[in-house]
């Protein structure tokens, strides 16, 4: 302090090795800003990241952190610690591929957060830490799957990971349908996407039962295109490697179910994944083909690169059998959503404003925000087809017309669609998975009492 190295300004960091009076080899001081001054949410998120980075930089397995009481605008102290725990867990995750084995590396073994608190406050404190930590684990589970290269992460691999989660957490029951079972019940639209691939398409159902059977389940449905070449309507080569991330919707379902399995809320939750690989070949679906959906509606496929909605529409029809309280689908569905919202907000559409408001609130609570876009009837005409009930593309306003397509299959229940094309990867996190929207989904599901 005498050398003015420790100013206390937000994010200011000083490292002191072997500090007298402590048993620690390394001590870091981080400035938290002016005392009694309310900080913004963004300032706190930045501080949490700096704390996590300092913990990682220490290159030690065990870290103790003392965080003073900080006033964050519109937030509680429990929220502060929940976000810090989540940030610590998420920041420690590193993905790399070495030799013959996919490996992930979690740097820290133990983190202890220190706080002066009474017995009543301790319960809330521990709950906030647990939820934050578990959501971070769920994010990392999602990131691990999304980052895995497509020659490994196939629909069969995704199904195996879902079953593996069930073995680790028996509270989740997993069922997998192969192509034979899907064809038998009429999921021809989903199957059409994988026609050109040697990889078998899979349909995965993960059920968590934390309440009476009479209670209607909340359902999350993930798009699981493990690699999207565009099919016959093939994509340009630059950045096509990023199309391994076209299964991030399904990764977020597995990550969220992982978090739910640990938190054990008193509700019923079902995670569904519609997975296929979209490849060009002599057996691939062609522009102009007409296929029948599980709902009985027919679809004219004008562009085989608009395939996500084709797997989702059959999944959205399938979940009717569960008599859901509501359904949320999650998909890297349109580049148009990235143009509209960039990499900050997830695009959200809904046929139920109460559900939409709850999702927006959960996005705010989790700092994993969504923004509602219109789902007006006037956009539906863009999907008119000369040869089928509906076309799979609709011209301009691509994120909206894609949501309009899905809305044709959700008339029997409360539904929302999350277009995560801009938030699942890219942007600030670079060419890797962000783990979003696991925080939003988990926050929402925990809010459903």
Predicted regions and their residues:
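Short amphipathic alpha-helical segment within the helicase RecA-like ATPase core
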Residues: 1-224
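A generic structural signal for tightly packed, nonpolar segments enriched in small/aliphatic residues
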Residues: 5-6, 142, 159-449
